[in-house]
Amino acid sequence: MSVLKILKYPDDRLRIIAKPISKIDTKIHNIIINMFDTMYYENGIGLAATQVNIPLQIIVIDKIEELNHPLVLINPKITKRSGLTSIQEGCLSIPNYQAEISRSKKITVTALNYFGKRIKLKTSSTLSICIQHEIDHLIGKLLIDYLSNLTNLKLLKKNK
């Protein structure tokens, strides 16, 4: 299909809160396919629709050990969290930058899949971190929001 343009920090459109999807149709399927094409092209493991200027609640994830197939989450909601873990995270919207972020170690998430079927996923480790990171994008939150104001200011100056 096609590779979409990824919004880069400090673009204000990254702060837009995504809207839930009420109907999964060909238009939504095409968005999902283009999101996977974009994520693979950029060598990412996850991508939220808001990162490609589409304000809809869609996440795509792949290339993670726990997955044996690409994962699509539409209207995802974390329903349970437990434990804490920290890991170095990167973001396609903040190129060449990584930071250690503390997140829930285990989560349970409900969502619709590519076909509109309701799914419930219990996960931990890298997949858990990736899902939390991408859901943050859907609510206008970036990994830098977990960092100090001084670190944010330095990154903002670097990316302008």
From Swiss-Prot:
Pfam families: Pep_deformylase (PF01327)
Family: Belongs to the polypeptide deformylase family.
Active site: E134
UniProt cross-references to NCBIfam families, sorted A to Z: pept_deformyl, PRK00150.1-3
One MF term in the entry's GO annotations: peptide deformylase activity
The protein's name: Peptide deformylase
Keywords: Hydrolase, Iron, Metal-binding, Protein biosynthesis
Taxon lineage: Bacteria, Pseudomonadati, Pseudomonadota, Gammaproteobacteria, Enterobacterales
Natural source organism: Buchnera aphidicola subsp. Baizongia pistaciae (strain Bp)
Residues that hold Fe cation according to the record: C91, H133, H137
Gene that this polypeptide is encoded by: def
Cofactor note: Binds 1 Fe(2+) ion.
Reaction equation(s) it catalyzes: N-terminal N-formyl-L-methionyl-[peptide] + H2O = N-terminal L-methionyl-[peptide] + formate
Essential cofactor(s): Fe(2+)
Cited function: Removes the formyl group from the N-terminal Met of newly synthesized proteins. Requires at least a dipeptide for an efficient rate of reaction. N-terminal L-methionine is a prerequisite for activity but the enzyme has broad specificity at other positions.
CDD domains cross-referenced by the UniProt entry: Pep_deformylase
SUPFAM superfamilies: Peptide deformylase
Top-rank taxon: Bacteria
Listed EC numbers: 3.5.1.88
Signal peptide stretch: none
GO biological process, alphabetically ordered: co-translational protein modification; translation
